[in-house]
Amino acid sequence: MTLHVGAEPAPREEEIAEMADEPRELEFDLSVQYGDEVTGDVRKACPKRKLIAEWIEPALFSSAQLTVRFVGEEEGRTLNDGYRHKDYPTNVLTFAYDPLPDGTVIGDLVLCCPVVEKEAQEQGKPLAAHYAHLLVHGALHAQGYDHETSEEDAAEMEALEVAILAKLGFPNPYQ
């Protein structure tokens, strides 16, 4: 789920194709945070900064300043309730802000560790694959992609996720 705070619309397929042909000299500033509930084995199971960057970079179509925050159920529920009026924790929330004048994307990705772990187990996926998917998903949201506006937008976002994850060596998360 994305919460847009004046964020620009996402680049469309034609623009992405053009960008793919151009040399990419993107800057990526990544900050990683852990909520108070994320300790011990839960924190150890979270992907480390280098891996997070490796998974997000292929999903970036412009320079970005992103914060990835790993939280527990209480903080996840509080954020989801406060911003989406849904009183339960969700796997990932993306807060997208107005880009900088040079087009740099700014956003916060919040991942609720217990929810991510439970979903990975229920879906029979490696935890790393599920985290990679949600980080790519959140990074696309931060750039304006949205799967809730139309079926066409959802299909476009899903296709991008599948292609990016395949480049990273992960299977299609929707199968």
From Swiss-Prot:
InterPro entries attached here?
MetalPrtase_cat_dom_sf_prd (IPR023091), YbeY (IPR002036), YbeY_CS (IPR020549)
Give the first-level EC class, as a single word.
hydrolase
The protein's UniProt keywords, in alphabetical order, are:
Cytoplasm, Endonuclease, Hydrolase, Metal-binding, Nuclease, Ribosome biogenesis, rRNA processing, Zinc
Q: EC number(s) of the enzyme?
A: 3.1.-.-
Where, subcellularly, is it found?
Answer: Cytoplasm
Give cofactor(s), names only: Zn(2+)
One Gene Ontology cellular component annotation? cytoplasm
Q: Which GO terms describe its molecular function?
A: metalloendopeptidase activity; RNA endonuclease activity; zinc ion binding
Q: Which SUPFAM superfamilies match?
A: Metalloproteases ('zincins'), catalytic domain (SSF55486)
Kindly give the Pfam families that the UniProt entry links to this protein: YbeY (PF02130)
GO BP, one annotated term: rRNA processing
Binding, Zn(2+): H137, H141, H147
Task: Cite the cofactor comment.
Answer: Binds 1 zinc ion.
The record's section on PANTHER family has:
ENDORIBONUCLEASE YBEY, CHLOROPLASTIC
Q: Which family does it belong to?
A: Belongs to the endoribonuclease YbeY family.
Q: Know the name of this protein?
A: Endoribonuclease YbeY
Query: Highest lineage ranks of the organism?
Result: Bacteria, Pseudomonadati, Pseudomonadota, Betaproteobacteria, Burkholderiales
